[in-house]
Amino acid sequence: KKPDRYRNRPYLLWIAECKGVTVRDIELRNSAMWMQSYIRCERLRIDGIKVFNQSNKNNDLMDIDGCRDVIITRVIGDSDDDGITFKSTTDRISENITVSDCIISSHCNALKFGTETTAGFRNVTVTNCVIRESSVKEALTGNAEGICGIALEIVDGGIMENIAISNIVIDGPRVPFFVRLGN
């Protein structure tokens, strides 16, 4: 069930409680809300997609929420709001996730853990990615060069465990890393 604040705006892809999902070699453009929302999925593969989401506020590139056994690779994306975003809005942790070989541009946070973090994140590897300034110079949310490259935010009491981030190029955002831990 979507939270009330999101009910009147459709996502382009909203996939909930599915197993063995593959999204491959497609191009997605300008959703009314978050481009892709994956909730409580298992064995999710996202490979070789191109995403441009600059038409509205809250135009996240993708949101991975309470999913496990996820591989995200070769994604090229440019979003007005957050880029690749991990959440845990319920008691189910987001875990066993690999992100590699992606190019992400965002007016906000290109790679974000949080802020909706009820359960948290475990066993996440991010490697060989480039974070750069958006191609769109006028931001609806955030700012043209991006707010942050990588944001690690636990604010709802969840855990953040075994997160490995390596071989990342960050060129553009005002702040390369932001960490916020709270309850």
Please report, for each region that a protein language model flagged, where it lies by residue.
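Extracellular/periplasmic carbohydrate-active domains that bind, remodel
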Residues: 1-183
